[in-house]
């Protein structure tokens, strides 16, 4: 399960 920081980091 990806962390919120990783999700926004990809964007």
Curated annotation (Swiss-Prot):
Keyword Secreted: yes
BP GO terms, sorted: chemical synaptic transmission; neuropeptide signaling pathway
Cross-referenced InterPro entries: Tachy_Neuro_lke_CS
GO cellular component, one term: extracellular region
Residues that bear Methionine amide: 11
Localization, UniProt: Secreted
Keywords: Amidation, Neuropeptide, Neurotransmitter, Secreted
Role noted for this protein: Tachykinins are active peptides which excite neurons, evoke behavioral responses, are potent vasodilators and secretagogues, and contract (directly or indirectly) many smooth muscles.
Record-stated family: Belongs to the tachykinin family.
Protein's name in the database: Substance P
């Amino acid at each position: 399960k990806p962390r919120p920081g990783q999700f926004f980091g990809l964007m």
